[in-house]
Amino acid sequence: MHRHTRYTPELALMLGLLLPSAGEAACSRVINVPVAATGQSVIVDGDTIKGIYPDLLRTFTEKDGCTVALSAVPRARLEMLFETGRADLLIPASKTPKRDAYGTFIPLVHNRAMLISIQSGRAPVKTVQELLEQTGVKLALVRGFDYGQAYQSLLATLETQGRVIMEVDALSVARLLKAGTVDATIMAPSIVAGAMMDDERVRDLLDKLRFESLRELPWGNSGAYISNSALGAADKAALQTALERAARSGVVWKGFQQYYAPAVLQGSIRPL
């Protein structure tokens, strides 16, 4: 499962094809994009920000396109910045009704959050109700992650039951799993696997993960939200054009294939 493929010439060519042609409208100012570490989708290594989505966004700076300024923040703060109009883009993000109130969503891939644990003899879990009935199962979740109303309702119930620890990022969750402090988490498998790939303290868990889909957490869309309040109409249109071009090209799905082993993507990420 462990894979360290990175920015290949084939992927670079696909990204290059996304560059705007001469005459297309450029953004009127630098586009402010705070990001949070999200597996291999967004990798924060000191002052360096890289990964599937930073690779994509940097193609928007070429020629007469949009210059993007990336900065690293915790996920919960990222959500707050977007909701208050201080982030021009929220990426990556699953489509949810709450976020729809603040931005225009552009889908880039299909995704699904799953119940993730270390392989064991525990009885299978197929629904939220079954998870709630297994009262001995304690979870760690990332503060700021949102996979829709069913996820939020589950989170509220787990908090009431005292069965959840909220963490700042997926790596912190992975360390709790390894320590046995918690039994499971819920997120897109690529996120927690990506965090494990880049940290030797938890890398040995990669081949021991158990992925289970929950009926109430079906397939949805993941992509980018363009802020409704932070940008003018012309800049919103320019970003929407660039992101929709990326969606049509399939470059984001190709990026996932370059960064992740098939076992991580199966059942949780697929192309549009």
Segments and roles (model prediction):
Residues P54-K63, Q129-K138, G220-Q257:
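Extended ligand-binding regions for polar small-molecule ligands
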Residues T67, G144-E159, A238-L272:
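Ligand-binding clefts/hinges and TM-proximal coupling segments of bilobed small-molecule sensing domains
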Residues R77-E83, A93-A101, S153, D183-K208, ...:
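A ligand-binding cleft/hinge motif common to bilobed small-molecule-binding domains
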Residues L57-D64, E133, R143-E167, A174, ...:
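Ligand-binding cleft/hinge of the Venus flytrap
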